[in-house]
């Protein structure tokens, strides 16, 4: 009997063990930069202390500012809290997931835990065809307005929880962040649900669907494509099938961006078909959701650069926005015709993050606009305000990959 045949059983055991460990503790290679660029320092000459002070000010106002005009974070009882969409008088999985991400990036464990407990207590579906999903829209008392899911909420929940698992040590009675994240990763791939409910990720297209229902799973939202997140899930998912799936999703989403971007303006639509074609009507325009695609492309480039396309694309869309002059409307047809007479700090914020991939000369005006903009207040402070703070973190070098200890 050959030595190879004698060693085969032992090798198989070693491979199985190493495969199981990959999901819990991926090797450090390929995990992106150990620190992210601070564009405010690079391009605006701001000191690190100035950048931190601006971020601290945004945190303080949005989490502990005036109840009526400033804050978004509202504590409930002894151990819960929610992020409020003030203008629509509701709580959304989008906002809760952004609040969690801001908290983990700023090392705010108490606020993170309060938010997550509210999510699990009020948004989570623990049975039925939606098991493992979260209601995207609730009243302030936690009752559901719409029990359905918006796919980006689950995506950002999973990523924030994984970062929390790697940043904070487990203590007796604490939230098991890693288990919560894995449950969401599993749920998003589960298409065996029955009735009208589907997987959040289309099993064949390997794209996040607009919503996991029979109708809304026939198309996607380009801003739900987060290849930088999928790259990390491909390392940290505890299942081999999951790791393979997320690796494929990262490749698909990068290719999808190339199909969905207008060749001249770089703009992408609010909703689109799986082949990148925009939906008909106003949802085929560059609108509120689509602002976020600018940052999605740039963050992926910052963490996992693959080719030169992300720079070309970021240059294209920032150049188009700058061509509008001093007043930059916040919505357009994909070929560049304005369909709005409003400006929004949320668009400037996402364009500033585009500087992680774009030519510095194109990025600098948007970084300056973001730096000079006041923290959003008033009725419509929710969406603009959260994008404002996320952009400060991403452009300011504070939006980090928090990896398992053994991968650092």
In which residue ranges do the predicted regions lie?
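N-terminal carbohydrate-binding/catalytic regions of secreted carbohydrate-active enzymes
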Residues: 38-154, 160, 170, 290, ...
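Bacterial N-terminal signal peptides that target proteins for export
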Residues: 1-11
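Extended ligand-binding clefts on enzyme/binding-domain cores
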Residues: 29-71, 89-93, 128-132, 146-152, ...
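Inward-facing hydrophobic residues that define packing positions of alpha-helical scaffold repeats
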Residues: 116, 161, 178, 185, ...
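Bacterial N-terminal signal peptides
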Residues: 9-20
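Short coil/turn linking the two alpha-helices of tandem helical-hairpin repeats
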Residues: 106-107, 165-169, 234, 238, ...
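A cross-kingdom marker for long, charged
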Residues: 297-300, 322, 335-342, 350-408
């Amino acid at each position: 009997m050959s030595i190879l045949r004698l060693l085969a059983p032992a090798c198989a055991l070693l491979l199985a063990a190493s495969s199981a460990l990959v999901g819990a503790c991926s090797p450090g290679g390929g995990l992106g930069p150990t620190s992210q660029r601070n564009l405010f320092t690079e391009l605006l000459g701001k000191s690190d202390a100035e950048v931190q002070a601006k971020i601290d000010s945004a945190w303080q106002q949005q989490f502990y500012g005036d109840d009526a005009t400033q804050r978004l974070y509202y504590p409930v009882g002894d151990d819960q809290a929610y992020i409020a969409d003030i203008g629509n008088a509701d709580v959304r999985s989008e906002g809760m997931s952004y609040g969690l991400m801001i908290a983990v990036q700023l090392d705010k464990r108490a606020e993170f835990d309060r938010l997550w407990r509210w999510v699990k207590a009020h948004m989570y579906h623990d049975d039925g065809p939606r098991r493992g999903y979260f209601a995207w829209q609730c009243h302030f008392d936690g009752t559901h307005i719409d029990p359905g899911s918006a796919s980006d909420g689950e995506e950002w929940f999973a990523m924030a929880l994984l970062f929390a698992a790697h940043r904070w040590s487990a203590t007796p009675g604490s939230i098991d962040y890693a288990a919560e994240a894995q449950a969401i990763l599993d749920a998003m791939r589960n298409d065996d649900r029955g009735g009208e409910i589907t997987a959040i990720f289309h099993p064949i297209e390997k794209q996040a669907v607009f919503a996991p229902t029979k109708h809304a799973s026939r198309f996607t939202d380009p801003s739900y494509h987060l290849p930088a997140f999928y790259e990390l899930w491909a390392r940290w998912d505890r299942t081999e099938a999951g790791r393979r799936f997320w690796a494929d999703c990262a490749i698909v989403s990068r290719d999808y961006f190339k199909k969905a971007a207008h060749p001249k303006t770089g703009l992408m639509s609010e909703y689109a078909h799986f082949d990148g074609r925009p939906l008909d009507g106003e949802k085929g325009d560059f609108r509120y959701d689509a602002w976020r695609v600018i940052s999605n492309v740039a963050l992926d480039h910052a963490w996992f650069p693959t080719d030169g396309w992300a720079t070309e694309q970021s240059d294209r869309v920032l150049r188009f926005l700058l061509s509008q002059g001093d007043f930059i409307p916040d919505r357009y047809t994909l070929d560049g015709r304005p369909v709005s007479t409003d400006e929004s700090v949320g668009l400037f914020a996402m364009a500033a993050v585009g500087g992680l991939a774009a030519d510095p000369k194109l990025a600098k005006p948007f970084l300056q606009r973001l730096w000079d903009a006041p923290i959003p207040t008033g009725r419509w402070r929710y969406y603009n305000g959260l994008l404002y703070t996320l952009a400060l973190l991403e452009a300011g070098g504070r939006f980090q990959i928090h990896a398992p200890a053994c991968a650092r």
